Amino acid sequence: MTTQLEQAWELAKQRFAAVGIDVEEALRQLDRLPVSMHCWQGDDVAGFENPEGSLTGGIQSTGNYPGKARNATELRADLEQALRLIPGPKRLNLHAIYLESDTPVARDQIKPEHFKNWVEWAKANRLGLDFNPTCFSHPLSADGFTLSHPDAKIRQFWIDHCKASRRVSAYFGEQLGTPSVMNIWIPDGMKDITVDHLAPRQRLLEALDEVISEKFDPAHHIDAVESKLFGIGAESYTVGSNEFYMGYATSRQTALCLDAGHFHPTEVISDKISAAMLYVPRLLLHVSRPVRWDSDHVVLLDDETQAIASEIVRHNLFDRVHIGLDFFDVSINRVAAWVIGTRNMKKALLRALLEPTDQLRQLEASGDYTARLALLEEQKSLPWQAVWEMYCQRHDTPVGSQWLDSVRAYEKEILSKRR
């Protein structure tokens, strides 16, 4: 440990103690908050089922940065490189298309055995796993409908895929000793004016009820459902709207997924957390950065990321909110994208833990909004970065931007040789 880092740490402890904050306790709390990294940043949401196929479902990965992972071995190696550069607890979020098999496997036939390599890898890296059925990039989703499809046979295919995915998710939780959160997102919707808004939603309701009919131990598996405002090709009507899934999660007591990019640009999910928590048992967050639409840019340490973290900490939602990331930027180094986004999420959580929330609540309750604003702003200038650097040091991860040297070396030695 450098003398400079030690000195900064000691000064930071004193500064935060002056406002009633125990920085050691803040770091202990930070170690209770895993962030689930998404595997699909590493290969542009291609997966291993049909890596050369088109990405569909109204989503896009844009850019042409070299070094994309081409198989599971490369993807796991890239993830390991990123994991080494991120302090504290992590998880990994997988999609169904990241299965491994020597022969083609239909999506409604996926089994735990197709993910055993991921489980063994997760054990070796002390990670929990989360899961998602993949209801896009498939011939049977080409017309824009899956679980709400008017054709009963196609609809059943997607129901069976989601049911099979839940068994995989439960397998993850059983094997790893930590529940897998399985999130259902579907692209279903229409490009232009839609006459019958009700029938597709009725079909989706019934399909979801069938999907979740098999019971699993909540210590192994947690169901979540995710809404979206619109997607490319589904600008006018989305079957799985916010109101639909809020009602579904409330009535069925599943987790509700809030994605930062899935709402109108003037809406923020940080303000939705406290409202939703009054009705649903759990929330899954997909922290992302929408630029004018659901563009899935890399997460920044910006106002909304901070607000999301502050909501979790201020309301002590550690055991009810699951933090996941969802972005895929192909214009920059993919390993760096993971590191930047995940470290930023963790920085936001730390800053929230270093806030004198009790004092701020008292000021708010007494109507002293002047002091509330003053303290909130002064808090931003306190030396939280010295606490972050100590956290990195204790977890044997690089301090500051030193991690970029490791990424550059990995790019030169490994990524640049991929064609």
Swiss-Prot record:
Signal peptide: none annotated. Its main location: cytoplasm. Disulfide bonds: none annotated. Keywords: Cytoplasm, Isomerase, Manganese, Metal-binding, Rhamnose metabolism. GO terms for biological process: L-lyxose metabolic process; rhamnose catabolic process. InterPro entries: L-rhamnose_isomerase, Rhamnose_isomerase, Xyl_isomerase-like_sf. Belongs to the rhamnose isomerase family. This is L-rhamnose isomerase.
